[in-house]
């Protein structure tokens, strides 16, 4: 009486186990590198998001610079030094003047780079002094460059460009450059 054989032979099982072991070892060596690259990419994206958020914030204020719903005296935009400090004035409440008091409702705002940190001050009248608030976290981000450049073109409103270069403090090789231009229609 014939006996039907079913299943795998011992040799086939051993060969299958050897092949799967080689594949598993290859995957085990590849996985940490994949996780490291994923973490590096995530950190760079977080740094880019942070820097672009700051650049857009400054650019928004630059675009509003000089707006006045009445008769305002003074300059709507003051770029100090090499462009690493900027003071912007605009009539936020449309009352026709650039309010200086109270400071919490002042129509002036300043941005400056000091000791690799972007800082801001509501009611700023100069780039010196104390009381400036840190906009970036110095324990996480090192701002190498913050610069506002004004380009005057005859017959047109000036173009204002915000340039920022930053690095991650934990990974200094992770560097982000951001540059964004707006038109100063009120200047």
Swiss-Prot record:
The chain crosses the membrane at residues 8-28. Residues 1-7 form a propeptide. InterPro entries: N_methyl_site, Prepilin_Pept-dep_B_prd, T2SS_protein_J. It is a single-pass membrane protein. Keywords: Membrane, Methylation, Transmembrane, Transmembrane helix. Its main location: membrane. GO terms for biological process: protein secretion by the type II secretion system. It comes from the Bacteria. It is found in: Membrane. PROSITE patterns: PROKAR_NTER_METHYL. The modification N-methylphenylalanine is found at residue 8. NCBIfam families: IV_pilin_GFxxxE, PRK10557.1. Not yet known. This is Prepilin peptidase-dependent protein B. It comes from Escherichia coli (strain K12). The lineage of its organism: Bacteria, Pseudomonadati, Pseudomonadota, Gammaproteobacteria, Enterobacterales.
